[in-house]
Amino acid sequence: MLNFSLCLYPVFILNKLVLRTQSIILHTINNASIKNR
C-alpha cells in the first residue's frame, strides 16, 4: 500500500503544477486580450 501511494504522490504533484500553469497561462491570455481592446 505504501508503494502505491509513493507512486501516486508525484503524479498528484505534477497534476497540481499543470493546473497551476494552465491557470497562469489563461490569466495572461485574458490580460493580453483586455489590453488589446
Curated annotation (Swiss-Prot):
It comes from the Viruses. Keywords: Signal. Residues 1-23 form the signal peptide. The keyword Signal applies. This is Uncharacterized protein VACWR204.5. Belongs to the orthopoxviruses VACWR204.5 protein family.
